[in-house]
Curated annotation (Swiss-Prot):
Chief site of localization: host cell
HAMAP family, alphabetized: INFV_NS1
Keywords linked to the UniProt accession: Host cytoplasm, Host nucleus, Host-virus interaction, Inhibition of host innate immune response by virus, Inhibition of host interferon signaling pathway by virus, Inhibition of host ISG15 by virus, Inhibition of host PKR by virus, Interferon antiviral system evasion, RNA-binding, Viral immunoevasion
Organism (species): Influenza B virus (strain B/Singapore/1964)
Record's function text: Binds and inhibits the conjugation of the ubiquitin-like G1P2/ISG15 protein to its target proteins. Since G1P2/ISG15 is an early antiviral protein, NS1 may inhibit the host antiviral response. Prevents EIF2AK2/PKR activation, either by binding double strand RNA or by interacting directly with EIF2AK2/PKR. Also binds poly(A) and U6 snRNA.
Protein name according to UniProt: Non-structural protein 1
Biological process according to GO: symbiont-mediated suppression of host ISG15-protein conjugation; symbiont-mediated suppression of host PKR/eIFalpha signaling; symbiont-mediated suppression of host type I interferon-mediated signaling pathway
Domain of life: Viruses
Subcellular localization(s) per the UniProt record: Host cytoplasm; Host nucleus
Family to which the UniProt record says this protein belongs: Belongs to the influenza B viruses NS1 family.
Length: 281
C-alpha cells in the first residue's frame, strides 16, 4: 500500500451473500446431475455430499437474518444458481437475476461490446468512508470494554466474558486496548447474536467493524452492505477474539490499515474483496 493511503474501506455487496450461496447451489445441482449419469467418482461423490451439508447449514443460518419474504430453500437457490452460470458462461447480462447484476465495462474500441471486461460490482457511487454512518442502529445498553495493562491472554478472556453477557439480537461492542495508559487501538463491532436452546450464543451477522489507531483516527472500516453472515454456528467469541488478537499485540508501531483489513476479511474467507494494492500488503 502506498504511504499516503492510510484508510481502508471494504464495501461488501450488493447481494454478495445471496449471490455466493445461489452460485454454490448451482454448482451442487451440476454435481448431482453428473452423479445421476453415474459419471462421478468416489472423491467427487464425497465433495458433493460435503457441499450439500455446508449449503444446507449456511442457508439455514442465512435465512434467520432475512425477512420471511426473502427466505429461499436450497431447491429455489439451485434454479437461480444455474441461471447465474449461464450469465457468466455466455456473457449475457440481459438475463437479469435478482441479487446478481454483473458489471460490464464496455470496450471503447467496440460499441457493440462482444467481449466485455467483467469486474466486481462497483461500490455505491458517492459513498466515501466518512459519509457512511458509523453506528447504523441504536443498541440498548452497548458494551464497552477497557483493557488496561493486560497481556493478550487475559484481555481475550475478558472480552469473552463480557460478550457472554450480551442478549440475543443486535449488539454493539467497543473494545479499548489500553497498555501502560496508552490507548493503542479501539475496535467497534456491530452485529447480531443468536441464542440457542442449549444456552450457547453465536454471532450470526457482522454488520460493521471499525478499527481506530492510537490517535483515534479511523484506519479501517468493514461495511457490510449485504450483511456478512457467519457460515458456521460456532460461538461468536472465537471470531471476536481472533480479530482482537490480529489487531493488537501491544506494539507501539502504528496500525496499518491494510493489515487490519486482511485480518477482518480473512475471518470470513473474504480476502478477495481487497484491492490488489491492499492484498500485496
Amino acid at each position: 500500500m502506498a504511504d499516503n493511503m492510510t484508510t481502508t474501506q471494504i464495501e461488501v455487496g450488493p447481494g454478495a451473500t445471496n449471490a455466493t450461496i445461489n452460485f454454490e447451489a448451482g454448482i451442487l445441482e451440476c454435481y448431482e446431475r453428473l452423479s445421476w449419469q453415474r459419471a462421478l467418482d468416489y472423491p467427487g461423490q464425497d465433495r458433493l455430499n460435503r457441499l450439500k451439508r455446508k449449503l444446507e447449514s449456511r442457508i439455514k443460518t442465512h435465512n434467520k437474518s432475512e425477512p420471511e419474504s426473502k427466505r429461499m430453500s436450497l431447491e429455489e437457490r439451485k434454479a437461480i444458481g444455474v441461471k447465474m452460470m449461464k450469465v457468466l458462461l455466455f456473457m449475457n447480462p440481459s438475463a437479469g437475476i435478482e441479487g446478481f447484476e454483473p458489471y460490464c465495462m464496455k470496450n471503447s474500441s467496440n460499441s457493440n461490446c462482444p467481449n466485455c471486461n467483467w469486474t466486481d460490482y462497483p461500490p455505491t457511487p458517492g459513498k466515501c468512508l466518512d459519509d457512511i454512518e458509523e453506528e447504523p442502529e441504536n443498541v440498548d445498553d452497548p458494551t464497552e470494554i477497557v483493557l488496561r495493562d493486560m497481556n493478550n491472554k487475559d484481555a481475550r478472556q475478558k472480552i469473552k466474558e463480557e460478550v457472554n453477557t450480551q442478549k440475543e439480537g443486535k449488539f454493539r461492542l467497543t473494545i479499548k486496548r489500553d497498555i501502560r495508559n496508552v490507548l493503542s487501538l479501539r475496535v467497534l463491532v456491530n452485529g447480531t447474536f443468536l441464542k440457542h436452546p442449549n444456552g450457547y450464543k453465536s454471532l450470526s451477522t457482522l454488520h460493521r467493524l471499525n478499527a481506530y489507531d492510537q490517535s483515534g483516527r479511523l484506519v479501517a472500516k468493514l461495511v457490510a452492505t449485504d450483511d456478512l453472515t457467519v457460515e458456521d454456528e460456532e460461538d461468536g467469541h472465537r471470531i471476536l477474539n481472533s480479530l482482537f488478537e490480529r489487531f493488537n499485540e501491544g506494539h507501539s508501531k502504528p496500525i496499518r490499515a491494510a493489515e487490519t483489513a486482511v485480518g477482518v476479511l480473512s475471518q470470513f474467507g473474504q480476502e478477495h474483496r481487497l484491492s490488489p494494492e491492499e492484498g500485496d500488503n
